[in-house]
């Protein structure tokens, strides 16, 4: 039996939703599992050379972690990875690997774990929920943790006229580097600012109202510290707004930038971002995408 798992890229944080809000995008990685007499990993795609093809491969580690959790020996598999989500760009590439490995293992084991159990394992591996939850479930998702540690996730309605435009530069930014610039504590005023703006953002995404989205994308917990890691950020922000964007934020830990626009302004926003980054000698791939509502899919062939 051959099992194919397709996992969407994700954009996380969306401004004020630091480490709790993310959305699945119409850009995917594919993981193909077939039982074998020995473990083997094969990776293809534009950045395949940067991905381990041995036991340290993240998708294979997730596959092995699943069986470790069950207390069973992992059956050897031939794992083929079709890599389309850019690495270390703030698009949830690690989340696709973790979800791909766990879901593939769950299928081969006969689906012993629920979505909730798979996500708890994924959050344990990833360290935060904002990418893995929408990667598995699709749509825009808010992750909420209980005092006791358990997780819940809500689907956030996303108006079809709110268009995500992703500007993906030709340089990487490791998540660890982006986290190192964050202060260890935040002021009450900044926390309150983000709470109120997150509420406004959820309303803006649901209704598509420009005035809410323009207000809501501001953040004080992570973006002010990370903007210095992204060449030309002030100019890019200004160019996006002048082209008609509701706002511009850092996608995940960066360096990809996410602009929210509408069907009329999306093309102009994409052009403005590409041309502005070129002024800083940065070649950017700009994609006008949509929210992917299916989440991870599994099929056998």
From Swiss-Prot:
Broad EC category: transferase
An annotated GO BP: threonine biosynthetic process
InterPro entries: GHMP_kinase_C_dom, GHMP_kinase_C_sf, GHMP_kinase_N_dom, GHMP_knse_ATP-bd_CS, Homoserine_kinase, Ribosomal_Su5_D2-typ_SF, Ribsml_uS5_D2-typ_fold_subgr
Disulfide pairings: none
Pathway info: Amino-acid biosynthesis; L-threonine biosynthesis; L-threonine from L-aspartate: step 4/5
Family of this protein: Belongs to the GHMP kinase family. Homoserine kinase subfamily.
HAMAP family hit by this protein: Homoser_kinase
Protein name according to UniProt: Homoserine kinase
Organism: Thermosynechococcus vestitus (strain NIES-2133 / IAM M-273 / BP-1)
Gene: thrB
């Amino acid at each position: 039996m051959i099992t194919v798992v397709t996992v969407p890229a994700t954009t996380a944080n969306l401004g004020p939703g630091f480490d709790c809000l993310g959305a699945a995008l119409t850009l995917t990685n594919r993981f193909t599992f077939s039982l074998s007499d020995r473990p083997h990993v094969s990776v293809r795609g534009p950045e395949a050379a940067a991905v381990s093809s041995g036991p340290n491969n993240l998708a294979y580690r997730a596959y092995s972690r699943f069986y470790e959790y069950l207390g069973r020996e992992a059956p050897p598999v031939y794992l083929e990875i079709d890599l389309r989500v850019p690495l270390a760009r703030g698009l949830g590439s690690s989340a696709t690997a973790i979800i791909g490995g766990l879901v593939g293992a769950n299928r081969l084991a006969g689906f012993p774990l629920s979505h909730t159990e798979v996500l708890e394992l994924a959050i344990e591996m990833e360290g935060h929920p904002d990418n893995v939850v929408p990667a598995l479930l699709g749509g825009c998702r808010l992750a909420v943790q209980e005092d006791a540690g358990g997780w819940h996730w809500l689907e956030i309605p996303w108006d079809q006229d709110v268009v995500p435009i992703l500007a993906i530069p030709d340089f990487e930014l490791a998540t660890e580097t982006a986290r190192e610039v964050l202060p260890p504590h935040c002021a009450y005023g900044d926390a309150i600012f983000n709470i109120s703006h997150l509420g406004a953002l959820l309303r803006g995404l649901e209704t598509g109202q420009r005035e809410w989205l323009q207000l809501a994308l501001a953040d004080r917990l992570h973006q002010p510290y990370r903007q210095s890691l992204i060449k030309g950020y002030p100019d890019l922000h200004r160019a996006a707004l002048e082209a008609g964007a509701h706002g511009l934020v850092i996608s995940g830990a960066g360096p990809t930038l996410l602009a929210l626009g509408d069907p009329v302004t999306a093309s102009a926003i994409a052009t403005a971002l590409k041309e502005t980054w070129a002024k800083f000698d940065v070649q950017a791939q700009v994609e006008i995408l949509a929210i992917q509502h299916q989440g991870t899919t599994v099929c056998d062939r």
